Amino acid sequence: MNKRLEEVRHQYRQGNLSRRDFVKYLGVAGVAAGLVGGPFGLVRNAMAQGRIRFDGWGGTTSQAFRRYAFEPFTSATGIRVVDGEFGDMDSYLTRVIASFPPGGEFNLAHLSGVFDYARYVGLEFNTALDESKIGNLELVMEAMIEPYRRITPEALSAVPYNLGQTGIAYNTKYISEEKAEELGASLLWDDSIRGNLGSWVEWRTNIWYAALYTGQDPNNIQDINAVWDALRKQVPMVRKYWGSGAELMNLLASEEVYATVAWSGRVAHLQEQGYPIGFLAPEGCYSWQECIFVMKGTDLDVAHQLLDFMLAPEASIAVAEGQMYPPSLDPTKVELTEKIKNLPAFDPTGKLQGYLFADPHYWNERQLEWAERWDRVRAGR
Amino acid sequence: MTITHHPYYMKKINWKPWALLSPSLTAIFLLLVIPILFVIVYSFWLRAPTGAVIPAFQFGNYARFFEDLFYPSILFRTIRVSLFCVLLCLVMGYIPAYFFHRSTSRYRQALILLIMLPFWISFIIRTMSWINILGANGFLNHFLMKIGLISQPLSLLYNEAAVLMGLIQFLLPFMILNIFVSLEGIDKNLLEAARSMGCNEWQAFKEVTLPLSLPGVSAGCLLVFVLTAGTYLPPMILGGAGNEMIANLIFNRVIGTLDWPFGSAISVILLLLLGTIVWTYNRYLGINQLFKAFKGN
């Protein structure tokens, strides 16, 4: 049924099928499909012809997207962009899986990390973009496109959009810049802040920094037991494992924690608001990049146009300033603002040399085992 | 000659109640029974390395839960916290319920309404508000430092006590209302009879009021226990490492590792545990007591 539907939808989009026949087919299919998700999905697809859905992180990021990309796009094409939000990657992926098979419910998403791209590809949610229809892709750093090409050499299913770092935020009232620089990743194990330490609840970041603390390459950990031991040592020192960016900012602003792993953009927001928070990017700092991923089943003509709008310098720069993460635009090709040049993780060369990103295959292969083990370690076992 | 098909012998079925119930039954079937069946089916499936699910029929997910003490220990913690929460709600809830019952004030209805007031505010907001009260820079620490009682902020957040505080704030009204309704149902003549037979105030309470209010107490305890066992927000927002409860574990498995089959298996185990408790309660005490709190007399 779904294969047939996809064929019919493809024929309709190619112009080989009239709208009347297409809708007629949907009606017949709806009757045949029964109760389990069928008719709801079909009606959704039928209604989706004049719109495309984009899911992002909300807040100032979505505002910038709406103002500089979605609204001009709707004015130019008449296609409405339905602006959805998510709290984190995993819960969004859960929703996407729940909507499987794809085709109408979710279209574009602001995914975090190359490993997420690999996860979506692994689940066969990817599509094949035509780069010739996304002119502004030429303005993007090649160093940011390359990791995606390695995963899907035949065709991209996403365009890189911004980059950032998960470094260490510390309160300068309690920890001097000199001390932070001197200790590096070891700051997260410093006994003087026992009980006032924070960390993200996510498994990957904790293992990454424990690898740095134990003198190992996070993308090639040789002694995982040393990592678990380091994390066991750290657990009693941690006051709170935060679960969202809002909680991270609250913990730092209220001085509940004096140091924590932190997202560079969130720290930049706190600094802008006048909080005495420093940001440390130690050697081996966890760098990541975000992309706009196009789901399987999306109308690619519309997606190409929208991606081009979003990569246009005025939109990309505005979004970057809104969310405080440098854009994927190559600084040697596009003149960026002073505000962006001063953001953490900004690379004026556009080459990203010295930036350490998570190896998607390495981390995804170990996700189930390590995430479960991390739960135990965090529980003090 | 057969007579079984004669209309006179056919049992009459009254379809009216079923017709009236059909919208509710349909909603329950579609929104509760079918999703639960999905969860049960998922619990026998497998997780692919990518996070996709593989249809299968095997008990590996259940075996995994019991194969070492890590997962059962979280279940035991959940039961322990739930029982502790029941005890605290009972102690803290009986007194105000009794006070409302005995009150002759013209503000009595308004006071009862105050019990319902927290329901008008989002549960998340109510839970988050404890951070501003108990935090290092929160109201309580600020006040204690201001009056010179402490020189350093006390660590009041991100522990089991904070979780219990959040749970009690959420669940106390359920306990109070159940006990209050039970007390209201007691025939006042019984108390007068007890007094006329020489009982003092305390004896009358101990011999008459308390025993007759026990159905309300047990209904409140059941409701608080079941709601606590399935709660997710207070441990997440107010708890620290090691304060996770079973609902948080289910969230981590389903959302964090995309392990839907194992998350479903844990959900089924929780469902069976709570179902057994409710069934036992209904078997010996009757479930109808629960509805009285929401119906009044």
What are the roles of these predicted feature ranges?
Chain A
Residues 49-118:
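Early extracytoplasmic/lumenal segment of secretory-pathway proteins
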Residues 47, 290, 295-358:
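Mature extracytoplasmic/periplasmic domains
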Residues 116-119, 253, 259-276:
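A ligand-binding cleft/hinge motif common to bilobed small-molecule-binding domains
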Residues 59-66, 89-90, 110-253:
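Extracytoplasmic ligand-binding site segments that recognize negatively charged/polar headgroups
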Residues 16, 38-58:
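C-terminal segment of N-terminal export signals and the immediately downstream linker at the start
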Residues 15, 21-43:
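N-terminal export signals
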Residues 1-21, 44:
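N-terminal secretory signal peptides
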Residues 228-234, 242, 271-296:
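Periplasmic-binding protein-like
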